[in-house]
């Protein structure tokens, strides 16, 4: 049952609020650290770790942590291992439907775990507002995910990969997802390393993303394109008013901070 992940009481567990540590770890540098932009503090730090960023004690119960790990994060970890085995020197790869479904489930979970989304679900007058805060988080993380999945969100999108061939690294917003216009339609990115992003393209652009059943990879060789994508990622996280933007290298975060500071 959906509510099996929810129990009463407060667990003293250090939870990753939204983005799991296994994804953040992929943005570590050679020192096993990551640079990060702190949205609330408006500063760039250089000694972040996957274990410490985006965490809070007691945010989820231990049972919900186990549920998310087993149902969402472990399957997605297997997809990441599969992606790491792909030959990106080719311009297309075969991706099975289970892989695509797992990626969507992970994206749905990221949306449901967004603290802003959770806060909106638990506003005054909603029955959730009468529950302890941890139970609210548990409920929305599980049932919000199920509702998003049931409604077929993103079902009109096809999975492809963006391969960053430039020296400018992709940045990871802790929210995970960001959207932008691609050939007149909305596209959605989820960076999984400084050089690879999962990309959902609307099915009306199927000729761009698929050829004879194989997924066409979208290679980026123009640094300006990567910087534009990073700007969308940075902007999306800042709009949430909380969280971090992560990168193995500081210079790109400094550039983005300067860009957005000049607009405020």
Model-predicted regions and their roles:
Residues 1-264:
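Alpha-helical structural context detector biased toward long hydrophobic helices
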């Amino acid at each position: 049952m959906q509510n099996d992940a929810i129990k009463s009481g407060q667990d003293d567990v250090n939870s990753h609020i939204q983005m799991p540590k296994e994804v953040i770890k992929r943005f570590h540098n050679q020192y096993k650290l990551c640079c990060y932009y702190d949205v609330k503090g408006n500063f760039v730090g250089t000694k972040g770790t996957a274990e410490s960023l985006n965490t809070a004690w007691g945010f989820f119960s231990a049972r919900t942590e186990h549920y998310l790990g087993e149902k969402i994060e472990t399957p997605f970890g297997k997809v990441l291992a599969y992606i790491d085995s792909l030959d990106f020197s080719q311009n297309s790869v075969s991706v099975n439907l289970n892989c695509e479904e797992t990626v969507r489930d992970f994206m749905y979970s990221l949306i449901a775990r967004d603290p802003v989304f959770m806060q909106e679900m638990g506003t005054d007058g909603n029955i959730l507002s009468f529950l302890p805060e941890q139970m609210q988080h548990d409920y929305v993380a599980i049932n919000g995910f199920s509702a998003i999945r049931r409604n077929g969100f993103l079902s009109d999108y096809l999975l492809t990969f963006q391969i960053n061939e430039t020296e400018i690294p992709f940045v990871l917003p802790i929210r995970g997802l960001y959207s932008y216009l691609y050939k007149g339609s909305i596209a959605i990115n989820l960076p999984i390393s400084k050089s690879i992003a999962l990309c959902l393209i609307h099915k009306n652009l199927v000729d761009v993303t698929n050829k004879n059943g194989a997924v066409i990879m979208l290679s980026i060789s123009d640094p300006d394109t990567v910087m534009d994508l990073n700007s969308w990622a940075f902007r999306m996280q800042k709009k949430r008013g909380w969280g971090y933007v992560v990168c193995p290298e500081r210079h790109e975060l400094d550039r983005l901070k300067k860009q957005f500071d000049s607009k405020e």
